[in-house]
């Protein structure tokens, strides 16, 4: 899959900056979950969106919670092409806009973060963007935040209790601080090691896992899943394996609630 910066807006006007449309807003920061919700106060921001069947809309602004890097709407599927874990409705079959912002949001506090001179940087914007776009095209977290619910519908991804992992990681950091006065380096493989729900340790490397992680792979099941979304998703740009006019003829008017990815805070 290849993402390209748009050269023109939906009306055919050439953009001064490829992929960028700037808007002056009245807020200095905004609750990211509220921004993507159906809250009536968001309708004015929905007007900023470009045609959802031709563009992926990325909203870049300062979040009220500095510990959240990004957030995203999940893909919406027509009922005839439903996919486990995603909203299934014919209400989006023919629409090109919603009454509220729909897309991915990135916390602009971190938009200039890089790989940090060869050292791992959990705020690296490229990883955040890749993770959120994964949500937008239908991928779920490969971990469970509490307990061991393997709920990403991909049998070939590792799963762990992320809350347990972060608690153990803090103990590991505290132990290093006591032994070495905080000057001891730890490798990325070491801090990315989790104990899976099957009791087997592994080094996390999946883009849909979370800090700390190599974040450079997807699995076959994940590829199958996002290919299904790309080929049939209601609000996803690109060529489809279904007659669009046929989908539009089945469009319904029921209201559907957006499904938002909830990524853990980084603290």
Name what the model sees in each region.
Residues 1-19:
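Acidic helix-start/capping segments at beta-turn-to-alpha-helix junctions
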Residues 1-7, 25-132, 136-266:
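Extracellular (secreted or membrane-anchored) zinc-dependent metallopeptidases
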């Amino acid at each position: 899959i290849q993402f390209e910066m748009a050269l023109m807006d939906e009306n055919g006007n050439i953009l001064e900056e490829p992929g960028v449309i700037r808007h002056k807003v009245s807020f200095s920061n905004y609750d990211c979950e509220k921004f993507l919700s159906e809250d009536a106060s968001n309708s004015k921001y929905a007007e900023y969106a470009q045609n959802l069947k031709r563009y992926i809309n990325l909203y870049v602004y300062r979040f009220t919670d500095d510990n959240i890097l990004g957030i995203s709407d999940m893909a919406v599927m027509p009922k005839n092409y439903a996919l486990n874990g995603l909203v299934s409705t014919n209400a989006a079959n023919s629409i090109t806009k919603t009454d509220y912002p729909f897309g991915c949001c990135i916390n602009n506090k971190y938009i200039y973060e890089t790989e940090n001179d060869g050292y791992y940087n959990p705020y690296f914007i490229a990883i955040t963007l890749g993770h959120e776009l994964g949500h937008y095209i239908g991928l779920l977290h490969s971990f469970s935040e509490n307990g061991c619910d393997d709920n990403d519908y991909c049998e070939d991804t590792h799963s762990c209790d992320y809350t347990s992992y972060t608690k153990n990681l803090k103990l590991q950091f505290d132990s290093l601080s006591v032994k070495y006065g905080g000057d001891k380096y730890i490798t990325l493989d070491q801090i990315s090691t989790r104990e899976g729900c099957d009791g087997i340790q592994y080094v996390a490397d999946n883009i849909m896992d979370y800090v700390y992680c190599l974040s450079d792979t997807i699995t076959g099941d994940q590829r199958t899943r996002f290919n299904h979304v790309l080929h049939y998703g209601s609000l996803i740009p690109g060529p489809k394996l279904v007659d669009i006019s046929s989908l539009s003829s089945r469009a319904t008017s029921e209201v559907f609630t957006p499904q938002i990815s909830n990524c853990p805070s980084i603290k």
